């Protein structure tokens, strides 16, 4: 997991690494479209979900309530924990541990999503091992990874694993209850809960030349080193974020959770993950500008334009300062990059700028595409 140091001069968050469900065969999912408070029985062996009868559940099944008006952490943990895995990496470039979750599974193999920084040291050589809830350990291979989004996909040769249910991060609100599941400090299947503290929080992680830019979900659910790549879930057990970073005090006196955790929104992550599975590589959106890194004012100043890219085609002049994107205020260059990367290539966005000649103007810009690093 990455540790984050908050800078008081802006809303930007500079992060450092935090290292440390549907069921098998598509029988059922952790979240359903049933009304709130549906009573179900979960088969202890297969994890298949059945509506509870008038006499309750048999001894071979566990009684749970899905979608209760107040978040039912016990139910969510029981349903989703089997989809979350522990990841261990041993490599010459460094060893570590983290978390991941099963995204897709067929009869012979499964795809697992985690953070790039969890497995980066084994990108060229090393051993990656995935541990399931039942204690089974499986060798894993890297399918693809994206440094810019801090995401990676692993493959294991074990099929019919329970998979997590995908939620919609665009529909969550500040104050909503959430649950985090992962393996902090190697402690597998650790479950914590909290709320969504903020949305669209600009977070950068990594070092110069290998930075990740995340339009993060902020949560106060306890997230600690080793939680990287784990699941952030909504009140119905659907994944809405990939846990990636935590904030720490700049003094370095506190290295664990201080109630400031950050997750990659699942809508953003899913696009990248699907591309990695399909092609082994992914893409990122391009505005077509080079920012003036010496600019110290509010906003992101465009130093120059890329020929024939979106910004130039839209008529934005060089020297303009971006102040908002789709109505979201932009405080600085990082905020602009993070916001742009939250879109898919080909999206059309509204960019509001202060013109070099003075005055404000909005432009409709279609984002280009480029290979992600």
What are these regions (language model features)?
Residues 43-47, 54-56, 117-119, 158-159:
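Acidic glycine-/aspartate-rich tracts in secreted/extracellular proteins
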Residues 112, 311-334:
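Conserved PDZ fold ligand-binding element
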Residues 3-38, 55-78, 94, 130:
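Glycine-rich, low-complexity segments
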